[in-house]
Amino acid sequence: MTQIILSEKIEAEKRTDWRSMWIAIVMQFVVGVQISVYYMSMWPYLSGVSFIDNMESKKFQTFQLDKTADFDFLGWVVASCSIGCTIANPIYGYWNQKTMSVKWPVITGFLIAAVGQLWYALLGFFGNVKWFMLCARFLTGLGVGNIAALRVYAAMASTPKDRMRAISFGTGGFVLGFSFGPVISSIFTPLGEEGIQFGGFILNMYTIVSYLMVLICLSACLVVYLFFKESYAGIVTKEEKEKDEVEVPMFDIPASLICIYLFMIVNMTATNIEVMSSPLTTVLYDWKDSDSIFYNGIALAISSAISVAFNIAQGSTRIGRIDKRKQMLFGLTFFLLYQLFMYPW
């Protein structure tokens, strides 16, 4: 495996700032949560939810939020967040590269995501709700595209010795957040669709999660601004290159493209599981929306625990030293088995 090779002198001088690294890992967890938190509750929220029927009496009724919404459109709503993230990723990456700053791209992203989450919470006040939901999720995607800066920081702020651990834990944070997001929705199912009324607003099992996401985004901005200190132990300076104390390998384009492709497979499979689980189990087992969100949340909690355990093992044990190709083939085998078991034979 090609990697940056440092002289003993340079390696002794450089240290990974693990305090800032752990903050970056937690921020990746927050990004994962922001992306997936509605995956199981999105269709129930759109197809049948409590909202204001009469502004003067502030009377809430439960019926379809948007009668023109169908399951095909749900696919576009789910995709809109990923599309926004895809557009924003290179922008945040370019911003980070030009300014050598992670702090402000991350803060800006979370502020944009907070606006998107607040918009999602207030869908009941709008007409043409399905389009507003799509726009709200797209805006959230533009915000959480800041994960590009966070992932770059994991590489730039860690020494070659610590890089595997830093990237594994960062990936584990994102995977935990991505898997744990729907679990958060399931926690609030006891509120039901009617929820609690506060003036012109309603806190039910759908909207309270959105307000919580807004609070988490703003809290993340505060944490990054106050406690995050940028340290780039992994960057090779011009002086170090000139002294021949560092050996930097050529960029391996084919390997990078393969890794990007595999990452797409992982995310498509995970998204498929989380989005389809709620409507599928509702039909198969005749569950109520709240039951579907709750029980699928339990299943995903177990799944996320297993995923994080593997990421921790990869960064902390000898498993991380196993040939990377063998590790990828091992993981892909389970994705293939999932497709075989889920196929309607």
Q: At which residue positions do the language-model features occur?
A:
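Short amphipathic helix-loop junctions that connect adjacent transmembrane helices
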Residues: 40-72, 275-295
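Hydrophobic core of transmembrane alpha-helices in multi-pass small-molecule transporters
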Residues: 29, 116, 128-145, 264, ...
